[in-house]
Structure formats: structure tokens, C-alpha cells
Curated annotation (Swiss-Prot):
Keyword Calcium listed: no
GO terms for biological process, alphabetical: thiamine biosynthetic process; thiamine diphosphate biosynthetic process
Its EC number(s): 2.5.1.3
Broad enzyme group: transferase
Protein name: Thiamine-phosphate synthase
Gene: thiE
NCBIfam families given in the database record: thiE
GO cellular component, one term: cytoplasm
Binding of 4-amino-2-methyl-5-(diphosphooxymethyl)pyrimidine, residues: Q39, L40, R41, E42, K43, N71, S110, K137
Family statement drawn from the similarity comment of this UniProt entry: Belongs to the thiamine-phosphate synthase family.
Organism name: Campylobacter jejuni subsp. jejuni serotype O:23/36 (strain 81-176)
Cofactor mode of binding and number, as noted: Binds 1 Mg(2+) ion per subunit.
Pathway: Cofactor biosynthesis; thiamine diphosphate biosynthesis; thiamine phosphate from 4-amino-2-methyl-5-diphosphomethylpyrimidine and 4-methyl-5-(2-phosphoethyl)-thiazole: step 1/1
């Protein structure tokens, strides 16, 4: 799967205040609109709740044949036999996660400094940001200049994350990205299908999708 990884429209999903039914409907409509990969990010749930929700999201992703990743929790990814995991700089090292998960799983890594490119061995893609301030990333923004430098030097695909919406996609035009990761632009939209469809159109207009 990692050799055919479509990162173009990457959805980072959290249930938040939505009912489970509403949450899953939002994800399904987003997939129909063009989301190509989903990462389940649940900081507030305990392991058992995370696992149970993960089973349902995984079933949905399998039905539409898109990759399903878990944020941070290698143990949950293993328990679910998810397609992979996304790790932050303070999470388990990539080489250890790779040893646990095996060669066929997808591992993404958050990165925001050029010097961190020296330590990405074993990762399949990078998530770089935040591009704009968000409720979860209020500080430590990544400049577009630095994002562009990281994209040009990275041997693996790079996804921009953090406050990305349709307007931001115009600012990202020409940067050597493999895709963008969104949260609120889809999860808070009145119509997740239309939101995803419009984002996908803008992605194809503005990004080379290397």
C-alpha cells in the first residue's frame, strides 16, 4: 500500500462533539467527496474507547479502499491492524514503530525543522505545519518558505497541515507537496461531501502532488 499512497486530501478526524452516527456519516461523505486517506486522532478517549471507534472508522475506510491510520498510538494501530500510524516528534521513534508494525505499514512523521530530515529513515511521508494558527496548534507556525525548503529536500512525500482550507491552498501554489491534511475544513463543514470535493479541486489546481 505504501508504494501507491495517495496523500492528496488527507483527513485528520476526531469525533469531538458529534454523535457517533453523525461522525461516521461525515467521514463517509468526505470520502465520497475525495478524501484519500484518514487519520483517526482521539486525544480524549481511553484506549478501549479509541479501539472501539477505530473499528468502525476502519470498516468504513476498507469499504472505500482508502488507508486508515492512527494518530500517535502504535498500540491501537497494532490492535486494529490499521494501515499505519502517524507519529509526532515526541512519540515513539520511527525505527521502533517500524520494528513493531512491520515493513508493509504506513508511518507518517510530523516535522517542522530542516535538520529533522536527518532522522526520517523508515517513514513513508512527512506532515509539516502548522501553516496557520488552529485551536490545537496555536503557536510555532511554519513559514511557507521553510515548508518549501523541506519539500524540496525531502526524499519522501510531504503533506501540509494546520489551518489548511481553500484560501490557504492558493498560498501553497507551486510548493512541492504531495497533499494537504485538513481537520476543520471538512469536519466543521455543513456538507462534508461538497467541502471535500471543492478542496480536491483546489488541490489539483495548485499542487504538483509529487
Amino acid at each position: 500500500m505504501k508504494n501507491k499512497l495517495d496523500l492528496s486530501l488527507y483527513l485528520v478526524a476526531s469525533q469531538g462533539n458529534k454523535s457517533e452516527e453523525c461522525f461516521l456519516n461525515t467521514l463517509e461523505n468526505a470520502i465520497k467527496g475525495g478524501v484519500s486517506i484518514i487519520q483517526l486522532r482521539e486525544k480524549e478517549l481511553n484506549a478501549r474507547e479509541f479501539y472501539k471507534l477505530g473499528l468502525k472508522v476502519q470498516k468504513l475506510c476498507k469499504a472505500y479502499k482508502i488507508p486508515f491510520l492512527i494518530n500517535d498510538r502504535v498500540d491501537i494501530a497494532l490492535a486494529l491492524d490499521a494501515d499505519g500510524v502517524h507519529l509526532g516528534q515526541e512519540d515513539l521513534e520511527v525505527k521502533l514503530a517500524r520494528k513493531l508494525l512491520g515493513d508493509e505499514k504506513i508511518i507518517g512523521l510530523s516535522l517542522k525543522k530542516l535538520e529533522q530530515l536527518e532522522f526520517i529513515q523508515g517513514a513513508n511521508y512527512l506532515g509539516c505545519g502548522a501553516i496557520k494558527a488552529t485551536p490545537t496548534k496555536e503557536s510555532s507556525l511554519l513559514s511557507l518558505e521553510l515548508l518549501s525548503q523541506i519539500c524540496d529536500k525531502s526524499p519522501i512525500g510531504v503533506v501540509a497541515i494546520g489551518g489548511v482550507d481553500k484560501a490557504v491552498l492558493d498560498e501553497l501554489k507551486g510548493i512541492n507537496l504531495s497533499g494537504v491534511a485538513v481537520v476543520r475544513a471538512i469536519m466543521d463543514a455543513k456538507d462534508a461531501f461538497l467541502a471535500a470535493k471543492e478542496l480536491k479541486r483546489k488541490i489539483y489546481e495548485n499542487l504538483p502532488l509529487k
